[in-house]
Swiss-Prot record:
GO terms for cellular component: centrosome; cytoplasm; Flemming body; mitotic spindle; nuclear envelope; nuclear membrane; nuclear pore; nucleoplasm. This is Nuclear pore glycoprotein p62. O-glycosylated. The inner channel of the NPC has a different redox environment from the cytoplasm and allows the formation of interchain disulfide bonds between some nucleoporins, the significant increase of these linkages upon oxidative stress reduces the permeability of the NPC. Component of the p62 complex, a complex at least composed of NUP62, NUP54, and NUP58. Interacts with NUP88. Interacts with NUTF2. Interacts with HIKESHI. Interacts with OSBPL8. Interacts with CAPG. Interacts with SAS6 and TUBG1 at the centrosome. Interacts with MCM3AP. Residues 128-137 have a biased composition (Polar residues). It is found in: Nucleus, Nuclear pore complex; Cytoplasm, Cytoskeleton, Spindle pole; Nucleus envelope; Cytoplasm, Cytoskeleton, Microtubule organizing center, Centrosome.
Length: 526
């Protein structure tokens, strides 16, 4: 099984395994494994496999390690893996390179692809190849596709893989769509997968097929996945980024699990593939049994068709077949993928910034709306109060109108009676004097009212003047200065009056003395 395994199991597991596998004859697994497994595991293997397996040449474009003749392990291998062949970013010594020639595969080999950007089989990277009749392709966190053809047991766990693998598998949160068939024929590369297989079982693309066997399906806990049976194989699907297999002209039962079909898929076939491969083979073996294609949340990409006819003869199969496959299309490089991711990240940051700006504006608007709502609520309360006051005022006015009507009703007969008696009444002298007195009293009353109003105004003005003055008012400062001048002038006036009185007294004293001296002088001269 594959997935996030943190313990040691008998069979190797693909995907973040931190345990230690102990058996030697087990199936290769792909995924991020941090342990040493029994056989070659594909993916980020940070351990050293302890058990060697069958020796096969490896097909890789870039190898990080030196390979020994054992089972091929594809993927980023950072340990000393005894696997001989694998697809993916391997920057080491590899036997086959890109070729368009015929190649033969040995039995008991497993071609597992993990995080590869090209299409590769056992002997070439673009041409189609035939694999052996025994092998397993468990996938775990694999972006690639693996093709095997014999009965085996594989489990998918958190895999992005797509490919046709002939094994019963239990899927557990597998993000790949694995279609099973009897024999793989054509591998074509998609932007995220080294190869995707298109298998048509009606003699169209089957180089050599073994006797049809019963299909076994074991469904584990799958998410967005559905299991389909094929000859001696089963397929586990679930949330695959590349979608692989097309099967046609056989009794097939296709289950759809929220998949997006590829644009270039054939209308008469049940497709789960993102690539279109046209192959013509002449087979001599028995036809395959009923195959089943399953789809599960396949995010299909544009079909890439690779051109390059090649015929491959399988050595492990009793029948020989000629496969002419055409598959064209460049694979997406890691730099292009990184540039796309960077572009998407920048766009996401711009959208986040724009969203934050809009969120701040929305928050400001929300606060404004809340404040306005509170103001509207208070205004509504005030309006209700005013309405109540208006009702009371209307009632009082109605009461006054009713009183006026009653008064008019009472005065109207009196006015009529006065009009009737006006011709017979003669005014006397006392009546005239009385009227004059009334008019005079009215005038005096009006004058008194005006005087009372004037007194009220004067009192208010005095109260305002006598209150605490505002020192900051320039008019008050001018008033203070004028008051000081007035006080000074009053003091000068008082002082001058006092001085004037003293001068007068002094002048009177001088006059009296002068008169006395004159008298004394007259007496003396006489």
């Amino acid at each position: 099984m594959s997935g996030f395994n943190f313990g040691g199991t008998g069979a190797p597991a693909g995907g973040f395994t931190f345990g230690t596998a102990k058996t030697a004859t087990t199936t290769p697994a792909t995924g991020f494994s941090f342990s040493a497994s029994g056989t070659g595991t594909g993916g980020f293997n940070f351990g050293t496999p302890s058990q060697p397996a069958a020796t096969t040449p490896s097909t890789s474009l870039f190898s990080l390690t030196t390979q020994t003749p054992t089972t091929q392990t594809p993927g980023f291998n950072f340990g000393t893996t005894p696997a001989s062949g694998g697809t993916g970013f391997s920057l080491g010594i590899s036997t086959p390179k890109l070729s368009l020639s015929n190649a033969a595969a040995t039995p008991a080999t497993a071609n597992t692809g993990s995080f590869g950007l090209g299409s590769s089989t056992l002997t070439n990277a673009i041409s189609s190849g035939s694999t052996s009749n025994q092998g397993t392709a468990p996938t775990g966190f694999v972006f690639g596709s693996s093709t095997t053809s014999a009965p085996s047991t594989g489990s998918t766990g958190f895999s992005f893989t797509s490919g046709s693998a002939s094994q019963p598998g239990a899927s557990g949160f597998s993000l790949g769509s694995v279609g099973s068939s009897a024999q793989p024929t054509a591998l074509s590369g998609s932007p995220f997968t080294p190869a995707t297989l298109v298998t048509t079982t009606a003699g169209a693309t089957q180089p050599a097929a073994a006797a049809p066997t019963a299909a076994t399906t074991s469904a584990g806990s799958t998410l967005f996945a559905s299991i389909a049976a094929a000859p001696a194989s089963s397929s586990a699907t679930g949330l695959s980024l590349p979608a692989p297999v097309t099967t046609a002209a056989t009794p097939s039962a296709g289950t759809l699990g929220f998949s997006l079909k590829a644009p270039g898929a054939a209308p008469g076939a049940s497709t789960t593939s993102t690539t279109t491969t046209t192959t013509t083979t002449t087979t001599t073996a028995a036809a395959a049994a009923a195959s089943t294609t399953t789809t599960g949340f396949a995010l299909s990409l544009k079909p890439l068709v690779s051109a390059g006819p090649s015929s491959v003869a399988a050595t492990a199969l009793p029948a020989s077949s000629t496969a002419a496959g055409t598959a064209t299309g460049p694979a997406m490089t890691y730099a292009q993928l990184e540039s796309l991711i960077n572009k998407w990240s920048l766009e996401l940051e711009d959208q986040e910034r724009h969203f934050l700006q809009q969120a701040t504006q929305v928050n400001a608007w929300d606060r404004t709306l809340i404040e306005n709502g509170e103001k509207i609520t208070s205004l509504h309360r005030e309006v209700e109060k005013v309405k109540l006051d208006q009702k009371r005022l209307d009632q009082e006015l109605d009461f006054i109108l009713s009183q006026q009507k009653e008064l008019e009703d009472l005065l109207s007969p009196l006015e009529e009676s006065v009009k009737e008696q006006s011709g017979t009444i003669y005014l006397q002298h006392a009546d005239e004097e009385r009227e004059k007195t009334y008019k005079l009293a009215e005038n005096i009353d009006a004058q008194l009212k005006r005087m009372a109003q004037d007194l009220k105004d004067i009192i208010e003005h005095l109260n305002m003047a006598g209150g605490p003055a505002d020192t900051s008012d320039p008019l008050q400062q001018i008033c203070k200065i004028l008051n000081a001048h007035m006080d000074s002038l009053q003091w000068v006036d008082q002082s001058s009056a006092l001085l004037q009185r003293r001068v007068e007294e002094a002048s009177r004293v001088c006059e009296g003395r002068r008169k006395e001296q004159e008298r004394s002088l007259r007496i003396a001269f006489d």
